[in-house]
Amino acid sequence: PRSGECRIFGEDIQRMQPVTRERIALLIENHVQYTFMNIEQIERFYSAFYPKWNKEAYYELMRKLKVAPKQKISRMSCGQRSQVALGLILAQNADLLVLDDFSIGLDPGYRRLFTEYLREYAKAEEKTIFLTSHIIQDMERLVDDCIIMDYGRILIQKPVKELLDTFTRYTFKISSPDKLPHDHGRAFAVNGEL
């Protein structure tokens, strides 16, 4: 956006009090540091910085995602590192979780598992989650309201249910796309799918 103001919990974000900042957990891309630690060590390290730390939330997610407690972060895949970062965010026990492309590196199965877990967690713990994602289908069960933007301009802003009721998606399979007239063939997706 090129104008306006941003307020969180009633405060301007540029002049926010430290006590208000404690209520916010932020996850950005490429988010795991201290890769020489294992998941137990990094949990203990982070816990010292957050007064409302909830280690049960961290370890519950690690168990659900089957991440071994002594596993070194440096030996983890990108997806596993994302899982650790997500656990650290949940353990901060913040009122507002801001997740920027949280699913980067997670395969579809783990994305689905984490999305389900996040939905249950937010409801049970009464948390607000603000997230961005390029994978819309994962968000249908998680998001109440949706804003679709294009280079800072809002294209659509409405509740997800209303958005889904407004638009319909069709998929057509063409057995022989090479037999379509030349000028029509370019309008169809590659691999015979529309």
Segments the model singles out, each with a brief description of its role:
Residues E22, I28-V84:
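ABC-family P-loop ATPase nucleotide-binding domains
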Residues S103-I104, I136:
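Short loop immediately C-terminal to the Walker-B catalytic DE motif
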Residues L113-L194:
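ABC transporter nucleotide-binding domain
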Residues G4-D12, V19-T20:
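Conserved ABC transporter NBD signature motif
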Residues L97-D101:
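Catalytic Walker B motif of ABC-type/P-loop ATPase nucleotide-binding domains
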Residues R2-E5, Y151:
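Conserved coupling/switch loops of ABC nucleotide-binding domains, chiefly the family-specific signature
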